[in-house]
Swiss-Prot record:
This is Myosin light chain 1/3, skeletal muscle isoform. InterPro entries: CALM/Myosin/TropC-like (IPR050230), EF-hand-dom_pair (IPR011992), EF_hand_dom (IPR002048). The keyword Acetylation applies. Keywords: Acetylation, Methylation, Motor protein, Muscle protein, Myosin, Phosphoprotein, Repeat. Gene3D superfamilies: EF-hand. The modification Phosphothreonine is found at residues 65, 81. The modification N,N,N-trimethylalanine is found at residue 2. GO terms for biological process: muscle contraction. Non-regulatory myosin light chain required for proper formation and/or maintenance of myofibers, and thus appropriate muscle function. GO terms for molecular function: calcium ion binding; structural constituent of muscle. GO terms for cellular component: myofibril; myosin complex. Residues 13-25 have a biased composition (Pro residues). Isoform MLC3 is acetylated at position 2.
Length: 188
C-alpha cells in the first residue's frame, strides 16, 4: 500500500481588515433661524436701536454691511465674539461680509438673538480671567503681558486696538489694576 500523502488543508482566509474608522464628522453648526426669533424689545428700544443702526449707514440707503453688524451690536451694549456675530449672520464669506448689506428689519432679529445669549461673560468672569496673570497677588498685571495676551490669544486684537484699549491704564511701573481695567472696559 502506498504511503499516505500529507494532504494540507487550505489555509484559512485571512481575516478581513477592520473597516477604517469613519472620518470624524465636523460638528454641525446649528443655524440660527432668524425668522423664528420673537422680538421682545419695546418700541422705544427698537427706536434707539434703529437710531444707532443708522449712524453706521455710510451710503444713506438705511443699510449697513455685514462687517458692521458686530460694531453696531457692541455699540448697543452687547459683547458678542466675532464667532457669535458670524454665526448669527449665517457664516458669510469675507467677500460677503464687505459686499452684502442688510436693513434694520433684518438686523433686529440678530440683536435679539445676541441679547438672548446668556453665555456672555460678566465682570467677575473677566476679573477671574485676568487674575491668572497676577503673579504677585496684588490686583495688578504687567501691561506688557496683557498687551501680548490681547494680541496673540483668543480673538486676537490689532496692535492699535490694544494700545487704544490700554491707553491711560498703566501706572508708573507699567502695571495695570485689572479690576479697574475691567470696569473701564465694561463702561465703554
Amino acid at each position: 500500500m502506498a504511503p499516505k500523502k500529507d494532504v494540507k488543508k487550505p489555509a484559512a482566509a485571512p481575516a478581513p481588515a477592520p473597516a477604517p474608522a469613519p472620518a470624524p464628522a465636523k460638528p454641525k453648526e446649528e443655524k440660527i433661524d432668524l425668522s423664528a426669533i420673537k422680538i421682545e424689545f419695546s418700541k422705544e428700544q427698537q427706536e434707539d436701536f434703529k437710531e444707532a443702526f443708522l449712524l453706521f449707514d455710510r451710503t444713506g440707503e438705511c443699510k449697513i454691511t455685514l462687517s458692521q453688524v458686530g460694531d453696531v451690536l457692541r455699540a448697543l451694549g452687547t459683547n458678542p465674539t466675532n464667532a457669535e456675530v458670524k454665526k448669527v449672520l449665517g457664516n458669510p464669506s469675507n467677500e460677503e461680509m464687505n459686499a452684502k448689506k442688510i436693513e434694520f428689519e433684518q438686523f433686529l432679529p440678530m440683536m435679539q438673538a445676541i441679547s438672548n445669549n446668556k453665555d456672555q461673560g460678566g465682570y467677575e468672569d473677566f476679573v477671574e480671567g485676568l487674575r491668572v496673570f497676577d503673579k504677585e497677588g496684588n490686583g495688578t498685571v504687567m501691561g506688557a503681558e496683557l498687551r501680548h495676551v490681547l494680541a496673540t490669544l483668543g480673538e486676537k486684537m490689532k496692535e492699535e486696538e490694544v494700545e487704544a484699549l490700554l491707553a491711560g491704564q498703566e501706572d508708573s511701573n507699567g502695571c495695570i489694576n485689572y479690576e479697574a481695567f475691567v470696569k473701564h472696559i465694561m463702561s465703554v
